[in-house]
Every structure is written in structure tokens, then in C-alpha cells.
Amino acid sequence: MIGRLSGVLVYRGRDHIVLDVRGVGYVVQCSERTLAGMPAPGGPVALFTELLVREDLLQLYGFPTLLEKEWHRLLTSVQGVGAKASMSILSTLGVDGVGRAIALGDWGALRKAQGVGPKIAQRVVNELKDKGPEVMAMGGTLEAALDGVIEDGMAASEGIEPPSAARPAVPSAASDQAGALSALVNLGYGQGEAASAVATAAGEGAVGETDIIRAALRLLAPKG
């Protein structure tokens, strides 16, 4: 299994890149958001990867963060959602949007992804409503675990020091939401209701872990 690749960008296509790793060129499928963040050819790239193995195909999919990779694995666990549909969802919504849609039961947001119909969108929400919050809560943990690992690995494998933009990292918004979710769960709220409140708070403009917690607590407070 190939879990991560770091090397030099050779080519960027419409839905994939060619990554040179010590003289070997790997074709890696990526979401539109990931492709948009790629450097110019010749620049350093590090991606976490998932290998799809079929009788007639070996296909690598690349992700700038472990959080996005985990969402891809979770999405493709749903019947009817293949790698292509998962990449379309991630391209359209990003990791924050996917987590928010599932936490809020907003299958209409998932329908915006090309190739995702209403039945599939509803199935994703229904099957992942309990598992999604667990992935949302991983954001901060993954960020801490990655600190310094990518730079050291790329420097050792390629003899170059990658710029900070090339380092896969969990987006700060995802980390803030993960921290807020963890805090609410520690206060005794159920993971599902906490995730819904965090997603709503973030969607209404709360920024930063503290503000998200405060806004979520207001949403969770008994009415009347």
C-alpha cells in the first residue's frame, strides 16, 4: 500500500498530476481543490494517497491532508459512492462543507456535486450521520500528529526544502471545529448533536474555536 508520496510536480492535468519521486513518475488523481493549490511544474508536492485496486485497474488518489483522505475513505464506504463521486463531492464542498452537510443532514448540498443524485446524497447523509462527527473530531489530532513530519520527509527524499504552501496540513477551520466538537462532547453533549451545533455555528460565521463553542452552546441551550 502506498500511503504518501513526496516529490516534484511534472505535469498537472484536468483531474490528475504526474509526480516524479526519485525518477519514477506517479499518476495521481486529485480533486479540483487540490489541483488548484498545486505549485508550478518543478515545485515540491507531498500528498497522502489511497490506492484503488481492481481487476483491471490500479489507481492512486491524492489528498493534501489526512483529514481529506479520511473523508474520502468514509464517503466511498457508502454503497453507490465510488472514488470518482467522492472526489466530485470533495471538489465541490471541501472537507469543511462535507462535514457540515452530513452533520446538518443537508443532502441538498451534496447534490451540487457532479454525478451525485438525490438518492445517493440522501444515502450518504443517512449512513454517515453517526460516523461523520468522528472524522470531524479528528481534525485537531491530525494537525498535531503531522507537525514537522512532511518537511523532514521531503527534505530527506528529495534533498530540497519545500515552501510552507507545499506542506499538507489540516485547514485551521477544520482544526477549530474539531476542537470545539471535542470540548462539547467533554461537556456531556452527544457527538451527533454537538457536531450539528458546531456545523451550524461555523455556517453562521463563528470563527475560532472559542467563538464556535460559545455559539454552539447557545444553539444547544434549552429553548423557552
Curated annotation (Swiss-Prot):
Residues 144-171 are annotated as: Flexible linker. Keywords: Cytoplasm, DNA damage, DNA recombination, DNA repair, DNA-binding. One of its GO terms (molecular function) is four-way junction helicase activity. GO terms for biological process: DNA recombination; DNA repair. Residues 1-64 are annotated as: Domain I. NCBIfam families: ruvA. Has three domains with a flexible linker between the domains II and III and assumes an 'L' shape. Domain III is highly mobile and contacts RuvB. This is Holliday junction branch migration complex subunit RuvA. It comes from Dinoroseobacter shibae (strain DSM 16493 / NCIMB 14021 / DFL 12).
